Amino acid sequence: MKNNISDVKLGLLAAKIYWKSWRFLELTEDDIISIALHAEQDSKKRFNPEFGLSFDNYLKLNGANFIRSSFRSMVNKVELLDSKSKYSLEKQNTVLNTPENYLRSLEFKEIITKAFNKAKNDQERKVFSLYVKGYKNFEIAKKLNISPRRVRYLLDLFKSYIKLLTERYGY
């Protein structure tokens, strides 16, 4: 009997996390199900009922972390078995399309550079580059000595550029 994504406890969450990268990562529904099952097994090992949480609430709070770690372990296994070309290795290492580092994937490198080129001044370019490198809003504000509100505004601008360019180029 074949599992369905909605039958697995973490299946829908895994599908939601990787919805932007199905095509580029070449993930099938079975891959997503296996990621979700692996994450569920891992969470069962680490679950401790002494803290007063039910298992379902524990999954709601920590499910995304377990899914990401099981995906990384799956990618590492693939990398060990199949290290054909530099491109495939680069694709495996850089495209972990969780919402945080979705912008750093290879597919959107061109979009990011075009959005970066739309920046009107040096401050915008610095904020954009730090954001793409993985810094959080508050860290960017501290580093560049500007207000967090200004950082939020500039990042919203950057994300709107990316959204516009994404729609234009059909990614």
UniProtKB/Swiss-Prot annotation:
GO terms for molecular function: DNA-binding transcription factor activity. It holds the Pfam family GerE. GO terms for biological process: DNA-templated transcription initiation. This is Uncharacterized protein MG428. It comes from the Bacteria.
